[in-house]
A protein has these predicted regions:
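Short, low-complexity N-terminal intrinsically disordered segments enriched in polar/charged residues
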Residues: 1-52, 56
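Short beta-strand edge/turn micro-motifs at domain boundaries
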Residues: 2, 129-159
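A short, hydrophobic secondary-structure junction motif
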Residues: 28-29, 33, 52-64, 80-87, ...
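Short beta-strand segments enriched in hydrophobic/aromatic residues
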Residues: 37, 54, 116-118, 149-152
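Short, hydrophobic secondary-structure boundary micro-motifs
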Residues: 46, 61-63, 146
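Surface-exposed, charged secondary-structure patches
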Residues: 59-123
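A short, polar/proline- and glycine-enriched secondary-structure boundary/capping micro-motif
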Residues: 71-73, 122-126, 154-162
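Short, surface-exposed coil-to-beta transition loops
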Residues: 96-99, 127-133
Length: 162
């Protein structure tokens, strides 16, 4: 995965100006992530845009609850995440919508707690709620997603950090 390096706070030659705008502030990059992964069953996702938001070394971590109640983590790079979710998105509508956000920033580093609800369509009931823990770094005039870790609410696990 190659990313052009912009100069002087403007997109590099040939970069998509809208994608560049997605990376200029924290709420916008988070909204763009949700837009990239949401859509009706079978609809193509904007994986080129999704890749653009991610640092080349970005990782995602999904928590999994096994049938016996034990948990484990599944870690993905960008391409393995896309490969993992594509069959699900082909068969099932998935709309993840942010319902709350908390940003903590120090210098060029930011952490975002982003609470979400997921539905199969925008008109159907919520199928799950949870939280994304997103780590960002500002370099080369833009924000980059370095890691996203998430878990879903379930019996005994409710988001109560604020």
């Amino acid at each position: 995965m190659h990313h052009a390096t912009p100069t002087h706070g403007t997109p590099a030659t040939g970069e998509n100006p809208q994608w560049w705008q997605d990376t200029q502030d924290i709420p916008t990059i988070v909204r763009a992530i949700y837009e990239c992964i949401s859509g009706p069953a079978g609809a193509p996702r904007d994986w080129a845009r999704f890749r653009y938001l991610q640092h080349p070394d970005a990782r995602s971590l999904r928590t999994v609850v096994d049938p016996d109640g034990s948990t484990h983590a599944v870690v993905f790079d960008v391409d393995s995440y896309i490969a993992d979710v594509t069959p699900y998105f082909a068969a099932t509508g998935f709309f993840e919508v942010e319902i709350d956000q908390r940003v903590e920033r120090f210098g060029q580093v930011a952490h975002v707690w982003s609470r979400y609800e997921a539905r199969e369509s925008l008109e159907t009931p919520v199928i799950k709620r949870g939280a994304n823990s997103i780590q960002l770094c500002f370099e080369h005039g833009r924000w980059w997603v370095f890691s996203t870790v998430w878990d879903n609410e379930r019996e005994g696990v409710a988001f109560d950090l604020w």
